[in-house]
Amino acid sequence: MTADDSQQAVIDFLSDPANFDGVPVKRIDTHAATVFLVGDRAHKIKRAVRFSFLDFSTLAKRKAACEAEIAVNRAYAPAIYRGVVAITREQNGRLAIGGRGEPVEWSVEMRRFDEVQTLDRLAEAGEIDESLAEALGRAVAAAHRLAPSVANGHTTETLSEIIAQNEADLTAEPELFSLDHVRALGAATRDALERVKPLLQARERAGLVRRCHGDLHLGNIVLIEGKPVVFDAIEFDDRIATGDVYYDLAFLLMDLIQRGLHTAANIVLNRYLTETRRVHDLDVLAALPLFMSIRAAIRAKVIAARHRQKGSQPELVNSARDYAALAQKFLAPAEPKLVAIGGLSGTGKSVLARTLAPALLPLPGAVVLRSDVERKALFGIDETEKLPDRAYSVETTIRVYRGLTEKARRITAAGYSAIVDAVFASSVERSEIAKSANSAAFYGLFL
């Protein structure tokens, strides 16, 4: 019996309700796994496949991958991941789950969740609203706080390898992607990486290269009890999952943008920045278009692999091409803008800022800076808490506007747009914010 035959027997076994006391079985196939949903449980086996980016071709490799999946994902979703279970062949020749016979396959056992609550399904239903986008930004920031730093992560070398592998994989699909497009994308991506290498190396030294999720698209996030829970992190290659935290975030931003959810993507980015409160994160915005482009190219080649497995399916062809086109779009030059919105409290500055932000380039839109949030950050309190009276002293106000000006300068220097929401009562405040625009176009609005 070949490996394929052996695994097909396991698939047939796990697909049969008769082996689960008649409980219906729902089967879900991906390019690298097959999941069987039964009652309140899910059994996930690795497919006996080998791609340029993963190898599950032997039973030993699939067992190791299952064990790694549990180890990695329990940090994100301990309530979902239960353990690794053997599929065994018993003395009577029958298969069993967790039996005493020889293991012929390995399964990740999980607690089943409502699959219509995954965020890709919610996106299709138009249910990713501003509140959920805010929660997403918080959830990713929380996950990254827990992610272990990796010394000598060689992030730029890894990115160079990923770019080269993306180009090779897309080139191998001439029916889907034109050679000219693939070559142009590869060249533009390499050039973009060269421009930000010193920045990324500095961030690695600062501990911002971490063992992250690695596959943070909407299909790998689910709502449980109303809160977004991240699952299905990459387990098969620590190198792929290790990188700058913004490279991890970029997958989610890219996926939202590809689905036309620009407002949600902008809210996620702004919430993430607010939660992390790292001023030097504003500098890494210079690398965000590159990160999103690489993620889009990865998605294109993964969908191409699925197309190859399933045969010609127009929706997969179109999807793969859309992601490849988006990868190129992210690298197109964009003219950043700095918009200062002034006026007294209650005049609608914040509403206007949130409305304008997703429409400004580069994607996913402008970073919104608010004087009230900046003031509360100085006092180390949450943006929903009330400030003490001393927070409104002249000295504090000077510090607030200096902080806003410095952040606006960093954002525009990184090639991104910024919107500053503040009173701007004095001419000095208005003059200084205009100077921070660098080469970006400046617009001042007073409500």
Q: Model regions: which residues?
A:
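Conserved substrate/cofactor phosphate-moiety recognition/catalytic segment
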Residues: A357-Y416
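Pre-Walker A (Motif I) flank of P-loop NTPase domains
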Residues: L208, A334-V339, G415-Y416
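Hydrophobic positions on the alpha1 helix immediately C-terminal to the Walker A/P-loop
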Residues: L352, L356
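Short, contiguous acidic/charged loop-to-helix segments that flank catalytic cores in large enzymes
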Residues: F236-G243, L256-R259, D382-Y401, A422-V428
